[in-house]
Amino acid sequence: MSYESIVGLHITNDEMYTQYRNAMTPILIEHGGGFRYDFVVSTVLKSESDKPINRVFAIYFQNKANMENFFSDEAYLKIKKEYFEDSVDAVTMISQYERT
């Protein structure tokens, strides 16, 4: 089993977001995580959110505790502040679930 989230983002700076992904991936792997799917979206046909979305991905961890530890990791938070905050305008949490 694993714990998975489907996330929609509105990315405003592709280059900086790519730097964020490159910098955070080793920390993600250390916490037993990874990306299962990753899409660049040009048209949203239906959304329950009023936030724009141009990127959708599935991120997974071995369990929910690993996810929580990753998102509170000091090294990750530093990378998030440096790259994510200025490259992403909106985050939509579409779903979170245990995958069997």
Regions found by a protein language model. Give the residues of each.
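Short S/T/G/P-rich N-terminal loop/turn motif that feeds into the first structured element of a domain
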Residues: 1-72, 96-100
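C-terminal end-helix/capping segment
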Residues: 85-100
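C-terminal structural segments of small proteins and small subunits
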Residues: 67-89
